[in-house]
UniProtKB/Swiss-Prot annotation:
Key words, A-Z: Carbohydrate metabolism, Glycogen biosynthesis, Glycogen metabolism, Glycosyltransferase, Transferase
Name of the coding gene: glgB
Broad enzyme group: transferase
Annotated organism of origin: Rhodopseudomonas palustris (strain BisB5)
Protein name (database record): 1,4-alpha-glucan branching enzyme GlgB
EC number(s) per entry: 2.4.1.18
Entry similarity comment: Belongs to the glycosyl hydrolase 13 family. GlgB subfamily.
Pathway per the UniProt entry: Glycan biosynthesis; glycogen biosynthesis
NCBIfam families in the record: branching_enzym, PRK05402.1, PRK12313.1
InterPro entries the UniProt entry points to: A-amylase/branching_C (IPR006048), Branching_enzy (IPR037439), GlgB (IPR006407), GlgB_N (IPR054169), GlgB_N_E_set_prok (IPR044143), Glyco_hydro_13_cat_dom (IPR006047), Glyco_hydro_13_N (IPR004193), Glyco_hydro_b (IPR013780)
Molecular function terms from GO: 1,4-alpha-glucan branching enzyme activity; cation binding; hydrolase activity, hydrolyzing O-glycosyl compounds
């Protein structure tokens, strides 16, 4: 047949047609079905109808454009193409119907599709009985988008996509399958060729430095068993073990453990140590090891460093089998500007702000999400819901919330753009955080969220309907800074800083707080937690034991970074395993034993956890003994008899006959003494119990051990 090439044909050949379906594939013309196919490397092509009818497709352009016709009604056919000496039967991607429905497009345009991960990305499926993969990507300003991969020899002319409403490009690729590697080849709005892009919605990716996305069949992922239903309840104990999966342990020198290898040891260790939760530093795919995961390029993909999505499911399941909740560090505040990532995705600032005063972090050299764009907010909120639903995650800790809330965060006076009211609050980010929390808790009421927020922003952990940001918890950065500053001082100087211990209780119940001794406190020259302790060797370890005991007795949930539980000496290094050999030395094993027992006590004594976030759960008893560095307080539970008396002595002196008033007469049992010889201490104490003195007011006469804290509970 004679084919006159039109402008539309050249638009397809030159890769600038927004809807190649309008030209390629089957088209009814003059009682025939005209078939056009673009197969750049083919030497001959036939169309074979479903009833066996065939038509020779003539090469009408040297770039591989073929055209011919079948009898009317032959819209289902295959292409029989010869490549050199090989002949293969191919399904024509341009004969299949659209993937996205009109309702899908409506929700996508409105930004209210909570299951974006069911629509966008790469999804293995059968369409009209043909197996393949449906690819959908957002690129509203692109002139052309092609999907390239293992299935088309990475040729961008083979599978040009069509644009639908609101800038979503789609294509069903017959024969593509789970495990295939792919990217999007994008031509920008001015005809410029962009770097090939990874899929923003990819469920897996190649190991760095490679950057291709990998097709995953999400419907075949095993569903981890659920964690205990009330594990995140406000009145339940919450003690979190923060872990960087790549450096907890290593094998054969310096090789990572896989997700499945970690599943064999890490959950059992966390359980043995008495922690209720584990929190992973970000597991989303990221190109740079040294970012620790905080500069992600693949928010929907568990990093391939440690295995596949199926392997990651196995790790979550192993934790849930031990009754341990799993929290993820989640990074919706910024992303790196790697060429294959989200930055300048369609040739414009699609995910980020175009103005660098709004769109770039000066400190980190990363790009900031544009929370004023509905597609971006939908992308992020759907990502949160994705982890909770598909992997059964029990909560999300949101990184760097302060950097999201303030437009002038870490910027010079002339380096930021005020909001519409002239203020520095990022109104769009506030709305995003509220929507994120509202949708998470509406769909998953038993999970939790936590904010790393380092300023005094009010009502971070108050419900959205009451004007708050809606988080379940907020990290208590003020407590962490004040108490670490206090404990790092020589005991002789601590009396001048007595208020650093007291001050935290002035605001301890203004939020639902987590007390964080996180990874940020053991890097960048800050030294390890043990490394901050003053004095000789005995005092350093005693100080650390006293500090940990103080932390577990203080109101608020607990978080401890890996290695701190046994007194790691070195700063954390993401390229090395923790120094597990230290546990061969009794003083480090003693620290580990103390943390294990503190976790046990915290979990089993209602007074230590039931009212963690309620002022009725705490009462100061001794606040004015600065000269002796002694504090005493009472922790309370729901039951009037649920009481725990705590005395902390941050001096190296022993105090005999130390008087403390208590609410009940009778015997008080010494539930824990951080100076016990079991933990490496001097074994000064009260022989396990003490009786109240005779008198009108119940009072205890105690022996207070040096650099230690003791816990006493009333006998029934």
């Amino acid at each position: 047949m004679t084919v006159q090439l039109t402008d539309e044909a050249y638009a397809v050949l030159e890769g600038r047609h927004a809807d190649p379906f309008h030209y390629l594939g089957p088209h009814s013309e003059d009682n025939r079905v005209v078939v056009r196919a673009l197969l750049p490397d083919a030497t001959a092509v036939e169309a074979v109808g479903e009833h066996g009818e065939t038509a020779h497709l003539e090469r009408v352009h040297e770039s591989g454009l073929f055209a011919g016709s079948l009898p009317n009604g032959s819209h289902r056919y295959q292409l029989r193409a010869r490549f050199g000496d090989t002949t293969v039967d191919l399904e024509d991607p341009y004969r299949f119907p659209p993937i996205l429905t009109d309702f899908d497009l409506y929700l996508l345009g409105e930004g209210t599709d909570q299951r974006l991960y069911d629509k966008l990305g790469a999804h293995p499926m059968a369409l009209e009985g043909v197996n393949g993969v449906a690819f959908v990507v957002l690129a509203p300003n692109a002139r052309r988008v092609s999907v390239v991969g293992d299935f088309n020899f990475w040729n961008p002319r083979r599978h040009q996509m069509r644009v639908r409403g609101n800038g979503y490009w789609e294509l069903f690729v017959p024969g593509a399958a789970a495990g295939d590697h792919y990217k999007f080849d994008v031509v920008g709005p001015h005809g410029e060729q962009l770097p090939q892009k990874s899929d923003p919605m990819a469920f897996a990716a190649e190991l760095r430095p490679k950057t291709a996305s990998i097709v995953v069949d999400q419907t075949r992922l095993p569903q981890p068993r659920p964690a205990p239903a009330q594990i995140n309840a406000l009145g339940a104990p919450m003690s979190i073990y923060e872990v960087h999966l790549g450096s907890w342990r290593r094998k054969d020198g310096e090789q990572w453990l896989s997700y499945r290898e970690l599943a064999e040891t890490l959950p059992a260790y966390v359980r043995e140590m008495g922690f209720t939760h584990v929190e992973f530093l970000p597991v989303s795919e990221h190109p740079f090891d040294g970012s620790w995961g905080y500069q992600p390029t693949g928010l929907y993909a568990p990093t391939s460093r440690f295995g596949t999505p199926e392997d990651f499911c196995a790790l979550i399941d192993a934790f849930h089998a031990q009754g341990i909740g799993v929290l993820l560090d989640w990074v919706p505040g910024h992303f790196p500007d790697d060429p294959h990532g989200l930055g300048h995705f369609d040739g414009t600032a699609l995910y980020e702000h175009a103005n660098p005063l709004q769109g770039r972090h000066l400190d980190w050299g990363t790009l900031i999400y544009n929370y004023g764009r509905t597609e971006v907010v939908n992308f992020l909120v759907s990502n949160a819901l994705f982890w909770l639903e598909r992997y059964g995650i029990d909560g999300l800790r949101v990184d760097a919330v302060a950097s999201m809330l303030y437009l002038d965060y870490s910027r010079p006076a002339d380096g930021w753009v005020p909001n519409k009211f002239g203020g520095r609050e990022n109104i769009e980010a506030i709305d995003f955080l509220r929507r994120f929390n509202a949708e998470v808790f509406a769909k998953f009421p038993h999970v939790t969220t936590a904010a790393e927020e380092s300023t005094a922003w009010p009502q971070v952990s108050r419900p959205v309907e009451f004007g708050g940001l809606g988080f379940g918890y907020k990290w208590n950065m003020g407590w962490m800074h004040d108490t670490l500053n206090y404990i790092s001082k020589d005991p002789i100087h601590r009396k001048f800083h007595h208020g650093q211990i007291l001050f935290g209780l002035h605001y301890a119940f203004s939020e639902n707080f987590i007390l964080p001794l996180s990874h940020d406190e053991v890097v960048h020259g800050k030294r390890s937690i043990l490394g901050r302790m003053p004095g000789d060797e005995w005092q350093r370890f005693a100080n650390l034991r006293a500090y940990y005991a103080f932390m577990f007795a203080h109101p608020g949930k607990k978080l401890m970074f890996m290695g701190s539980e046994f007194g790691q000496e070195r700063e954390w290094n993401h390229d090395r395993s923790l120094d597990w050999h230290l546990l061969d030395t009794p003083k480090y094993a003693g620290i580990q034993a103390l943390v294990r027992d503190l976790n046990r006590l915290y979990r089993t004594l209602p007074a230590l956890h039931q009212l963690d976030c309620d002022p009725f759960g705490f009462e100061w008893l001794v606040t004015d003994d600065a000269d002796r560095n002694v504090f005493a307080w009472m922790r309370k539970g729901d039951d009037p008899r649920a009481r725990c008396l705590v005395i902390a002595n941050f001096s190296p002196n022993v105090y005999e006959d130390y008087r403390v008033r208590v609410p009940f007469p009778g015997r008080w049992r010494e539930a824990l003494n951080s100076d016990s010889a079991v933990y490496g201490g001097s074994n000064v104490g009260n022989a396990g119990e003490v009786h109240t003195l005779d008198g009108l007011v119940p009072e205890l006469s105690l022996t207070i051990p040096p650099l230690a804290a003791i816990f006493l509970t009333p006998e029934d």
